[in-house]
Amino acid sequence: MTGDRGAHFGKFRGTVANNEDPLRRGRIRALVPTVFGPETTGWALPCSPAGFFAIPAVGAGVWIEFEQGDADLPIWTGCWWDSAAEMQPGLLPDPQRVLLQTSGGHSILLHDTPGTGGITLHNHDGQTIALTGAGIELGNGKGAAVALQGPTVSLNGGALEVT
């Protein structure tokens, strides 16, 4: 494959074509038109921090590199967004927020703003757990809520309070 393509150094824009790695190692196959035309890459290994495992969805924009420039040895090194509309709304425009969100809508938000920051877990059905400097809040997404602030436990927005 590389004999007729030459060496390819640097990052190339690609699009995920297949993310179902039969070896379950986090590999993807991508379309990289500037290198392969309409063909997909071979299985591209992930380049990610130790302990981190996330696979981009089919159709997602990914950066592709090649080990020692060899097109037979693709590596996917991260994702790119075509526009701000593709970004998760929980992130914009605050750089002090880190959001991990699945395509199914489950998320973990880490917010480092002093005084208002914290950790919030959401699932796709609307249940929430929020841990902040002010306290802990639990919600079932259907109206029931528990808030723990200082020595007070509040149920359903103050319908019952225990101190």
Question: Across the structure, where does each feature detected by a protein language model lie?
Answer:
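Hydrophobic packing positions characteristic
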Residues: 1-147
